[in-house]
């Protein structure tokens, strides 16, 4: 007798459940997505003990016909695709027909459903076995309850985390679904306590406000663009609002939340040097495209996708964000803390946001910032930044970045009056004149410059300011076509491992494009006899070593990245440090040079250069206005 045999359906469902149903959050995701596919406009999610004890989903969707109820719990039974061609034109969130049988095989499940034009159906299933089926009176829609999850798979139950952790996983999934489908009203309850309620009016900014707080919603920048193949819409926060994790960025593809690292990377690249190292924005990006251009059938939970025109999409995202930030004022306001009024009951408010009006009715032409493209430009005269001082060896003393307090979904509502304080996002061209004239007042601790104008008080980090000036100078100088070189008094020898040597050898021609000429010296060494004149004096070998590390790490020469990193490194080393006192003339010259830069708001590492206190804020602090 042969050893290989076909598994029965119940065992097959248990095995499939291992992939589809990892934890309570998986059940919530699959059932809520089924409700959305059934054209529901209102969905309630009730949890007990983070879903381990009970999960109940109530919707007002199309419901399931009596003759389909049993079939729906069979493996690979679905109403969403019919043939292989449909697999490449998927518009629904589900399509495999795996979720319901997998969930039913590891739980006690009760289903009450009706299509509205016939009596409803009541179905009870335990561990995959049908216990009861009968007709019942029911409104249109579906009410499905999952209890005692993993009761028959104790090994899986043993690896569940704490109630708090599992609840966090569920709320994260529900938040993403709420952002993906703002046209659906979602209510989330845990142990009869309301955690989330979205209005379902289609305004995603209201959803973002209810999830991330009204304070974050006030600092959202609308993003919108369209190409031949893609349409993107969404919101991202101003650079001053960041988090320590990428988890606050959500990417939606054709209504489906997906985890895609390259999309998140494109959002970060759109900020370019506006973000501090290790900090990430809060963002929501919805992408619509022809289903033929995306493969959603590559992950058990359908959380990952593959794009057939990925590079075009990434470029569109980067350029759209860069164009958006060119048009808004990026000087962070210090703000005034006001006491929040209390409310008596928790309710989802109708938020009214005044969106910044675009200058043109159509989308502006998207252009990469000057100096950031790959094209080599003809050499031109570049003004050397004013050398106001000798760099100090003392490090900058920086204050830690303060995390903005997130809104607790359990807190009692919002005040509509807060909406009147929504910061106006002014769309102005970033052309070097964005920064208004500043008049120096003085200096504090040899580190911060105080200046004023008719709009209030400005505090400037002098190191960050000159770092931005130097960065734009070096960025323009690095990689010019007509390279001026300077001979080294003593040739510099670079010793590498065999693997490193081979990687560098492949990129010799590319390195020449940034002015670095290497000659082979022995089996695993190179020598450098000259270097570009823009290398800061005394730092030549250090910069060469940095470039070699980049080539070895990347396994290729990324000219744009080399230029960027070299310019950033040199600008930091050549800039003033903390505890260096300046004369009034030096301060004035620094501020005037800062005004000529293309981005006077952040240093190349993304830290803010200046902070603004408006006259109104100062008067409020001193109780001159109430």
UniProtKB/Swiss-Prot annotation:
Amino acid composition bias (Polar residues), ranges on this chain: 383-393
Q: Which InterPro entries match?
A: DNA_mismatch_repair_CS, DNA_mismatch_repair_MutL, DNA_mismatch_S5_2-like, HATPase_C_sf, MutL/Mlh/PMS, MutL/Mlh/Pms-like, MutL_C, MutL_C_dimsub
Keyword DNA damage listed? The answer is yes
Question: Which GO molecular-function terms appear in the entry?
Answer: ATP binding; ATP hydrolysis activity; ATP-dependent DNA damage sensor activity; mismatched DNA binding
Where are the annotated segments for Disordered?
377-413
Q: Which SUPFAM superfamilies match?
A: ATPase domain of HSP90 chaperone/DNA topoisomerase II/histidine kinase (SSF55874), DNA mismatch repair protein MutL (SSF118116), Ribosomal protein S5 domain 2-like (SSF54211)
Query: What's the short name of a Pfam family annotated to this entry?
Result: HATPase_c_3
Q: Which GO terms are recorded in the biological process aspect for this UniProt protein?
A: mismatch repair
Q: Name one GO cellular component term.
A: mismatch repair complex
What keywords tag this UniProt record? Answer: DNA damage, DNA repair
Say what the protein does.
Answer: This protein is involved in the repair of mismatches in DNA. It is required for dam-dependent methyl-directed DNA mismatch repair. May act as a 'molecular matchmaker', a protein that promotes the formation of a stable complex between two or more DNA-binding proteins in an ATP-dependent manner without itself being part of a final effector complex.
Task: Give the similarity note.
Answer: Belongs to the DNA mismatch repair MutL/HexB family.
Q: What is this protein called?
A: DNA mismatch repair protein MutL
Q: What organism is listed for this UniProt entry?
A: Bacillus anthracis
**Lineage of the native species?**
Bacteria, Bacillati, Bacillota, Bacilli, Bacillales
